[in-house]
């Protein structure tokens, strides 16, 4: 029961933050971005289940960037291409793939993943008695 509550809380936190970032960046968002944000936040947090805190932060950020970019690509293919919802279209940006992901946003996700990693770690520590976070920079 506690594990279910933990994942619901982390999902809601990530979903709300992702949705808010979209509102601040683009001026609008779509409900699917709430869902995508929640899933990404949980996946970012699960990296500590497979890799230790001894992994340098920049590597955690790199893994998180790959997760977010991959999830954005999958969501874009399903929502924008298959279902035709046209929630976003990066076709006019350089280094895009199918108009769904682009290098410049992947770089942005690298930097935005740092506060997400730290927030997830501390939420798990404060609320669920998980290991106290500690980090290596290099």
Describe each region flagged by the PLM.
Residues 1-138:
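Aromatic-rich, lipid-facing transmembrane alpha helices and their immediate juxtamembrane interface loops
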């Amino acid at each position: 029961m506690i594990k279910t509550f933990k994942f619901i809380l982390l999902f809601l936190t990530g979903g709300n933050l992702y949705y808010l970032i979209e509102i601040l960046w683009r001026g609008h968002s779509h409900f699917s971005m709430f869902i995508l944000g929640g899933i990404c936040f949980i996946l970012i947090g699960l990296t500590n289940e497979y890799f230790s805190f001894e992994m340098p932060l920049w590597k955690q950020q790199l893994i998180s960037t790959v997760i977010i970019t991959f999830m954005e690509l999958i969501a874009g293919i399903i929502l924008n291409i298959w279902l035709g919802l046209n929630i976003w279209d990066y076709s006019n940006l350089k280094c895009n793939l199918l108009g769904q992901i682009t290098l410049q946003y992947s770089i942005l996700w690298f930097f935005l993943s740092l506060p997400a990693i730290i927030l997830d770690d501390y939420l798990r520590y404060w609320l669920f008695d998980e290991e106290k976070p500690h980090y290596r920079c290099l």
